[in-house]
UniProtKB/Swiss-Prot annotation:
This is Protein penguin. Residues 580-600 have a biased composition (Acidic residues). Residues 616-626 have a biased composition (Basic residues). PROSITE patterns: PUM, PUM_HD. Residues 76-89, 107-122, 601-615 have a biased composition (Basic and acidic residues). It comes from Drosophila melanogaster. The keyword Transmembrane helix does not apply. Residues 1-128, 577-638 are annotated as: Disordered. One of its GO terms (cellular component) is nucleolus.
Amino acid sequence: MVSSEPKGPANVANTASPLKAHESSGKRANGQKFKPGGAGGARKFDKFGGGAGKSFVKPGAGGAKKFDKSGPGGFKKFDKSGATGDKRLGGNKFRGKPQTQPQAPAEGEKQDWNKFKKEKKDLKLKRKSAKDTYEISKEANQIHEKLRCRRTENKDKLVEQIYKVLNVGDTISKVVKAHDTARVIQSMLKYASPALRAEISEKLLPFTVEMCQSKYAQFCVQRMLKYGAPATKAKLVDSLYGHIVRLAGHSIGSGLLDSMYQSATPNQRIYMRQEFYGDLYRKAKDSNVKTLSDTYKEATNMKASILGSVKANLDHVANKQLVDSALVHAVMLEYLRACDEDEEKLEETVTAFAALVPHMLSTKEGSEAAVICFYKSTPKNRRAIIKNIKEHLLKIANHEHGHVFLISLLNALDDTKATKKAIYDHLHGDLKALMSSPYGRRVIQWLVAPGDTTCFHPEFIRTVEEGLAFGKKEKELRRKEILEQIEAPIAQSIAEDAAFWLSNSHIGLVTGDILNHIQGESYEKAASALAQVVVQPEWRISADAAGPQPQDKKKPHNDVEAIIAQATKQRRKLLYVESSSDDEDEDEDEDEESDDEGDEKEQKEAAADDAEPKVKKAKKEPKKPKAKEEEPAAPLVSGIEEAGMHIVLKKILKNDGKREGTPFSQQLLQNLSSDVLKAWLGVNRACFVLLKLVEECPALLDDCKKAIAAERSLSQILADRKTPGAKLLAAKLDIGK
């Protein structure tokens, strides 16, 4: 408020006098402070005085006006506590409205738990019945109970009944996200006729994006992918356009997106990848853009912005740790190839994906992208990548695409000691598991025979050796150092269980490569153990050298109904065989359940009358699940007669002529007993093995002659045999002339 007193020198003197007094006396004892005020006088701040609070004194025409927090003229108080005045005592804005929770018992009163449970159950039922789809869902679930029964026939008729119930407005789109009715939709998609399945799918297609992000509706999308016709699957992929990047970063949708990408047509895959290139391609697709480089082929000035968009989308997916997807792997590979010149962006991307390399090795594109990440990363990032794959080394080595990354890593590292410590030492304890896998064997072969064209395809060798440009050490020196460090542990493993290393022809080929490359004591230790296995009279190997047959990679037949019908026929045959025994078991189970219910009632009545309850009948022990039929073991054949092992032995003997000391051929001949030699002379392939032995090691020719001539029967057997191997061996040893 403006003062009415005239402004002048006297007024200035009045305002200055308290200031002088303050300067002379300093602070007062009661803690009051004075500061110069405005033109109208002094402003007083009573902070520590005896007043009730902070007061502001301001002169005006009608006298001093005070602003105080407390007192009759203070601030207005708002009562937020409710009707009781205190929120802690139960006052709230919902007072007077019906309570949704059962009332708690009064103090000192015992809780009636049966009543409490009943009230909770009634409340739950009341909440459910308030929904507009409650009655429809209830009826659909009742029919579904019959549909899901294994013995129910004409299931397609029941599906039609459920569809009539649910086909009211947008009911299907509502119930598909619920935990119970989502199972109903799944069964409908499974057992419906082709026409009805297509109709149900058409109803669900507009909500595909929402279903892919739903906890329960996602399984309906899986059913559409599994049982839907090719046209339905194509529409399913088309319905995701515009939301690909968002689904790729969703914890539930990423898995479904990966399944759809793998089942999509080539053009659909291109369109799905285009959405990672930027917002321009989310709604408008370009059939001329096949890869990322096509987007800026005609407008190079847009390259930086497009690569920035791709990087942002990849970083979003990497932050969610959802990179285990063929779609993400394909985009990642295109991006790494495109930003080869921009080292700054490349380094940022490599750093972001270094911890996620194990998840990138499930596809061919992901493995190639991981190799590029490793090649072009700094030493710090390389150590991080090696650290992250340590716990997954066995799985990576046995994987179709992961083993390529591991071989590329072994071929590019300069520090061979660190390579052995970080990689081979972790794999050494699982050598048998590696040798049992076709891809694990390739890792061992590369360690002992890197770049050998007899073991690896020239194109594979060329691809792996591209990493040599990112190392400093000479190729031959690096490979020699690795072999010197691992040959002793491998030889020790062979000596401990030589029979395994000759258990089939595929493992035997790798064993032969190992034996042909190791030197010195390691060779003699391994050769001695293997020779003792070969000369055993009961040496048997697995005839099924390839192990379990790989699954047929051909695309399944598109006629899903024929597949379902065939499976149903087989199931019915099994049901008819076991129908009588199952019916008897079910009758017994029903009798037991009714007896149990009657016994419980009797026990309650007896407890009320202080009587002893009747003894319950002993329940029938549940049937133990039948054990799955074990796959028949592969037949065993004589190792010396098996065609693949015959090649292995000849391969080992071929390099014995260059060896010094005691080669495998000499140890084989020394350990060969007369009984085994007699059996060998009657086998064509065994005769060729002996022929190869004396041809490659002429010094052993006389020893072989003496061994056969020691017993007249052996010479006679060899002379009487008419097989090609026996004839050539007899001619070489001058026997029978």
